[in-house]
Amino acid sequence: MEFCGCLSELMNGESSSKRNGPSTLPVKEVRTDMRSKYSSDLSSYTSACKKDSNLKSFDSSLHQRTNIIITSLAARAETQSLNLDSLMEVYGFLLELNQNAVRVIIESREDVWKNKDLKSLVDVYFKSTSKTLDFCNTVENCVKRTEISQLIIRFAVKQFEAESVDTDLGGDKKKKKYTKTLEELNKFKAMGDPFDGELVTQFDSVYDQQVLFLEELRKQRRKLDKKQRNVKTLRTVSNVFFATAYVSVLVLSVVATTMSAPPVVCAVASGSTAPIEITGKWFSQMWKKYEKAVKRQRGLVLTMESRVQVNNEAMKNIRSDVDELRSWVSSILETVDFAVEREEEEEAMGLAMQGIKKHVDGFTEKMEEVGENAAKCSKFIALGRLLVLEHILGLPAN
């Protein structure tokens, strides 16, 4: 039954995409080999948590925050409401992880400066955060294009109001009464969907960078373990980075899977808050849940042929608003000829345009909110990067 349920979910999702939006573009295949591939690293991390109280505290906090984000994604998946807010929530979570990593770097700045391998980790950190900045910038650019569309539709409303009071309708001019209004409405349609393929490209880029980051950390951690086994600070920093990267890939994997198969993320979230005696073991336990859920759903993540365009799902609510606006516009265009002939219908037309105006106000307000969130995310990441540079570059060379 679970197998059939998964297939049904996928078929429903695919048919819905065909009905409600453009064909989907492929997204990155989700990683499911993490637990087995990094089993020794996870064991090392668990052992380190037992010996290091600071690392144990970090792990406990990380566990709690990860449970929150996974539970939130599961709740949204159950209601089929994964949208731009969900994606921004995930990136806010990743931002928080990066900020915590920055604090660890600063607290260990002397060791960072003296150890070339640890400095290499910092370099990888900057490369990783630059990808997140790119994504935030893309969101902001999409918001700017959306604002242009809303200015056009607002102007269309003003044109309608102006042309509605124009009584100079002689002969054939009656049919041309709303010419300017129609021109603006057509411009609005021509603008299309401001949230195009850029977002899915940026999401893939961030995801790839996180996986590369994790692989590089794996190599660097082993070097540090061999060279600096007795240096507590170095082990702590490397473990913090490893945990941050590992959880980032886990959460991004769950997000990508949720786009096409909500039951998977729900299975991951179920029981994820249960107490685990050994600190650090929750990494393996959570990923094990994820693997089992995927296998139950016919190896969903590994074999899925029907990929999902991330921005189609992430921007679901936004696209719904635009589709509703287009529906109103289409209805308005059909009633224009009748509205100019009958006063009652013209008043109805005016009410319809006022309704559009109110809806656009709410839409624009939401877009501004998303833009502010993206700008805030960019600002915090940029400040964190500068803060790291100030502390590291400000240290004496000797």
Curated annotation (Swiss-Prot):
Name of this chain's protein: UPF0496 protein At5g66660
Topology within the bilayer: Multi-pass membrane protein
Key words, A-Z: Membrane, Transmembrane, Transmembrane helix
Disulfide bonds: none
Primary residence: membrane
Family as reported in the entry's similarity comment: Belongs to the UPF0496 family.
TM regions (residue ranges): 240-260, 263-283
Gene Ontology cellular component annotations, sorted alphabetically: membrane
Pfam families with a match to the protein in the record: DUF677
Subcellular location: Membrane
Upper lineage: Eukaryota, Viridiplantae, Streptophyta, Embryophyta, Tracheophyta
